[in-house]
Amino acid sequence: MQPYIELVRRYVYRRILIEFGDDELGKLAVAIFNTLLSRGEAMTDDKLTSIVGYNAIDVRRILQALYNMRLASVVEEFNEAAGRIEQSWSIKDEDIRRFLINLIGGVLDKVGVLMQQLTNTPIYICPKCFKRYSEDDALMYDYKCPLDRTPLEYINPADYLTVLGAVEARLKKMMESVSKGSV
């Protein structure tokens, strides 16, 4: 599981960085991920706040983001002593496995669509912004990028299909490894 755990850590950091635009929240997300994973038990947000040493609002934001990524599990329980509902958060190996399967599946779908597009229609690409255009779109824009007016370049699909085929094979192998539980 260890090599995949590092991939998940990097993904969590980048996703939080993109979503919230704050490097500190990215580091907090990794700290929360590591804490929940290493402890192997469900913890309330208050307990996590005291462990990681950040304010409760940021910890709750990160926990909610991890939950939205389908990486963290939450259980709600009524605490009679406090008189309120408390949420206990956890990250289990099965959560990580499910997360990886969903993520790899999404990437495989995108690679498949791109390979299909490359085999069915000529593709032109802008060398500056790397946006792809079909033959019809390139013709409509007079073979110039509509964003920066750079001349579009025709790409040889055989070169890209070879690379994408290798990427697809590697992803399928990774998916098989994760699905079998031999991660």
Curated annotation (Swiss-Prot):
Family matches, as InterPro entries: TF_E_archaea, TFIIE/TFIIEa_HTH, TFIIE_asu, TFIIEa/SarR/Rpc3_HTH_dom, WH-like_DNA-bd_sf, WH_DNA-bd_sf
GO biological process terms held by the UniProt record: regulation of DNA-templated transcription; transcription initiation at RNA polymerase II promoter
Start and end residues of each HTH TFE/IIEalpha-type domain: 4-97
GO molecular function, one term: DNA binding
UniProt KW keywords: DNA-binding, Transcription, Transcription regulation
Domain of life: Archaea
Endpoints of the signal sequence: none
Gene3D superfamilies noted in UniProt: Winged helix-like DNA-binding domain superfamily/Winged helix DNA-binding domain
Family label: Belongs to the TFE family.
Quaternary structure and partners: Monomer. Interaction with RNA polymerase subunits RpoF and RpoE is necessary for Tfe stimulatory transcription activity. Able to interact with Tbp and RNA polymerase in the absence of DNA promoter. Interacts both with the preinitiation and elongation complexes.
Domains as described in the record: The winged helix domain is involved in binding to DNA in the preinitiation complex.
Biological role: Transcription factor that plays a role in the activation of archaeal genes transcribed by RNA polymerase. Facilitates transcription initiation by enhancing TATA-box recognition by TATA-box-binding protein (Tbp), and transcription factor B (Tfb) and RNA polymerase recruitment. Not absolutely required for transcription in vitro, but particularly important in cases where Tbp or Tfb function is not optimal. It dynamically alters the nucleic acid-binding properties of RNA polymerases by stabilizing the initiation complex and destabilizing elongation complexes.
Protein name (Swiss-Prot/TrEMBL): Transcription factor E
